[in-house]
């Protein structure tokens, strides 16, 4: 009788331990565990936006040099696929803000949001001009400065309601 109770108790403990430990595994950990990510090379994030000209910065953020950033719009839907890929990625040129990277002219994005950032203005205009062949829709200096100023004003007067889709 004692052996049967001991056997039942031991089986119950083993099953409880198995149930507890199986709940601790994450499905999207990188190969080799989370510490192995420093050894892995970062790949370019998925292309997104009109004509695939942009790059994903987060699950709902798509930015392109010439087009700006799309937040929570149809152009950024493809970026949700990044959550299911096993290797880490990085978009943008140089680090900016608090954990973000320069995404477009004057815009700094992290994986959660974008803000106007003056230090991200450098280099984008030259890069855009080098890429364009002869595009009549490209903005000239004064128009570009006005648009950039409007983006900066929108970033400083951003409302609390961030659930609405936005395009920067």
Curated annotation (Swiss-Prot):
Leader sequence residues: 1-23
**What GO molecular function terms would the record report?**
neurohypophyseal hormone activity; neuropeptide hormone activity; protein kinase activity; V1A vasopressin receptor binding; V1B vasopressin receptor binding; V2 vasopressin receptor binding
Q: Does the keyword Disulfide bond apply?
A: yes
Q: Where is this site: Important for agonist activity on V1aR/AVPR1A?
A: 32
One Gene Ontology cellular component term attached to this UniProt record is: dendrite
* Alphabetically ordered keywords of this record: Amidation, Cleavage on pair of basic residues, Disulfide bond, Glycoprotein, Hormone, Secreted, Signal, Vasoactive, Vasoconstrictor
Annotated positions of the Glycine amide modification: 32
Against Gene3D superfamilies, the record matches this protein to: Neurohypophysial hormone domain
> What are the recorded Gene Ontology BP terms?
grooming behavior; intracellular signal transduction; locomotory behavior; maternal aggressive behavior; maternal behavior; multicellular organismal response to stress; multicellular organismal-level water homeostasis; negative regulation of apoptotic process
Q: Main localisation, per the record?
A: secreted
Which PROSITE patterns does the entry mention? NEUROHYPOPHYS_HORM
Glycosylated residues, per the record, are 135
Q: Name one Pfam family in it.
A: Hormone_5
Disulfide feature? 24-29, 45-89, 48-62, 56-79, 63-69, 96-108, 102-120, 109-114
Task: Say if the entry is tagged with keyword Protein biosynthesis.
Answer: no
Query: Which compartment or compartments is the protein found in?
Result: Secreted
Query: Which PANTHER family does the entry mention?
Result: NEUROPHYSIN (PTHR11681), VASOPRESSIN-NEUROPHYSIN 2-COPEPTIN (PTHR11681:SF9)
Q: How does it assemble?
A: Interacts with vasopressin receptors V1bR/AVPR1B (Ki=85 pM), V1aR/AVPR1A (Ki=0.6 nM) and V2R/AVPR2 (Ki=4.9 nM). Interacts with oxytocin receptor (OXTR) (Ki=110 nM).
The text of the family note is:
Belongs to the vasopressin/oxytocin family.
User: What is the annotated role of this protein in its UniProt record?
Assistant: Neurophysin 2 specifically binds vasopressin.
Annotated protein name in UniProt: Vasopressin-neurophysin 2-copeptin
């Amino acid at each position: 009788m004692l052996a049967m109770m001991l056997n039942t108790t031991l089986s119950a403990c083993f099953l409880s331990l198995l149930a507890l430990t199986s709940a601790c595994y994450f499905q999207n950990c990188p190969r080799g565990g989370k510490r192995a990510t420093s050894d892995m090379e970062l790949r370019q994030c998925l292309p997104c936006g009109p004509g695939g000209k942009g790059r994903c910065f987060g699950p709902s953020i798509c930015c392109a040099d010439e087009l700006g950033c799309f937040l929570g719009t149809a152009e950024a839907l493809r970026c949700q696929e990044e959550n299911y890929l096993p290797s880490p990625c990085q978009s943008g040129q140089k680090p900016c803000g608090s954990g973000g990277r320069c995404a477009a002219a004057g815009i700094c994005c992290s994986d959660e949001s974008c803000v106007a950032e003056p230090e991200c203005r450098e280099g984008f205009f030259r890069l855009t001009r080098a890429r364009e062949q002869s595009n009549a829709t490209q903005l000239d200096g004064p128009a570009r400065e006005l648009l950039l100023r409007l983006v900066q004003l929108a970033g400083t007067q951003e409302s609390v309601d961030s659930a609405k889709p936005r395009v920067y």
